[in-house]
């Protein structure tokens, strides 16, 4: 395909050819296989000295052509030159802060809104109009920014405890984006939310998964928790139109929560997700994901 960039393995995957995938009988054989297959850099070998020894042995034994090593080195060095690392290897703090603190908020909001998928919309519940004067918002992900970000957001399994991230939650976005005269009431407690839903014009329940990545978050059957399914079902029993927003990085079995009046898959919408979800629910953006 003409790709001339750097190819890097995933974490520990060279060793996994021996220990997990059984595709190589030894570590030196695994190193030779990945290098010959086009991998230019191994991400974090468990022991870099062992990797170097295995690589040298494979070259001396003729398992890896020297020209392949030259190619890998050339690609890595070319990338470093393009990035200016030989001129100034340090990050510009001003540029880093500008990116992290939201120089592209408009783009992030646009991308999140356009990636949302409308899975269900019975009786044209969406978009919410000015007729919906009282809207109750609830659910474990309604006011939870880390749940909008997912795994690998600052930390491996998501935002570490004690770290604050600038952004807008769904309930904050709804409050800021609601039409004049529309009251948005956030109710965290499930029982109170069900009680208040009975006198509301609409309910927005935001459900999904906690942040996570491979390992701790692996699941043979990814599904919405029973507690969240029960919450959606109880809200539906009130007779008030229920708009369910799912925030997750993968498809989920929804069970009892699969047939609300409206169902929006918001995925992991990021720091501007609150504004983006509000844009979709209030009809400012057509969900086209």
Language-model region placement:
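Conserved short secondary-structure transition element at the edge of the structured enzyme core
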Residues: 27-40, 74-82
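Residues at alpha-helix termini
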Residues: 1, 37, 61-62, 83
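C-terminal non-catalytic regions of proteins with extracellular/luminal or membrane-system context
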Residues: 2, 11, 17-18, 24, ...
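Conserved, charged catalytic cores of large soluble enzymes
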Residues: 52, 74, 81-97
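Short acidic/histidine-rich active-site segments
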Residues: 4-20, 24-25, 33, 37-47
């Amino acid at each position: 395909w003409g790709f001339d960039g750097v190819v890097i393995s995933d974490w520990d995957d060279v060793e996994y050819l021996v220990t997990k995938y059984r595709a190589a009988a030894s570590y030196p054989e695994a190193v030779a296989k990945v290098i010959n297959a086009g991998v230019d850099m191994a991400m974090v070998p468990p022991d870099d000295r062992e990797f170097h020894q295995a690589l040298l042995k494979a070259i001396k034994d003729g398992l890896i052509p020297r020209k392949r090593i030259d190619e890998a080195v050339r690609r890595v060095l070319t990338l470093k030159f393009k990035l200016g690392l030989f001129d100034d290897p340090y990050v510009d703090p001003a540029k880093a802060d500008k990116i992290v603190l939201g120089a592209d908020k408009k783009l992030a909001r646009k991308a999140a809104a356009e990636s949302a998928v409308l899975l269900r919309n019975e009786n044209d519940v969406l978009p919410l109009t000015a007729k919906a004067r009282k809207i109750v918002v609830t659910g474990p992900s309604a006011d939870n920014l880390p749940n909008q970000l997912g795994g690998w957001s600052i930390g491996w399994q998501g935002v570490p405890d004690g770290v604050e991230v600038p952004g807008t939650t769904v309930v904050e976005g709804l409050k800021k984006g609601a039409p004049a005269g529309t009251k948005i009431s956030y109710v965290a407690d499930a029982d109170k939310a069900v009680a208040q839903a009975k006198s509301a014009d609409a309910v927005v329940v935001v459900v999904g998964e906690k942040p996570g990545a491979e390992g701790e978050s692996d699941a043979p059957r990814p599904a919405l928790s029973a507690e969240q399914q029960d919450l959606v079902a109880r809200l539906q029993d009130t007779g008030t139109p229920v708009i369910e927003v799912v925030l997750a990085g993968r498809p989920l079995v929804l069970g009892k929560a699969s047939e609300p009046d409206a169902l929006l898959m918001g995925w992991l919408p990021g720091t501007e997700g609150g504004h983006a979800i509000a844009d979709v629910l209030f009809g400012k953006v057509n969900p086209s994901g």
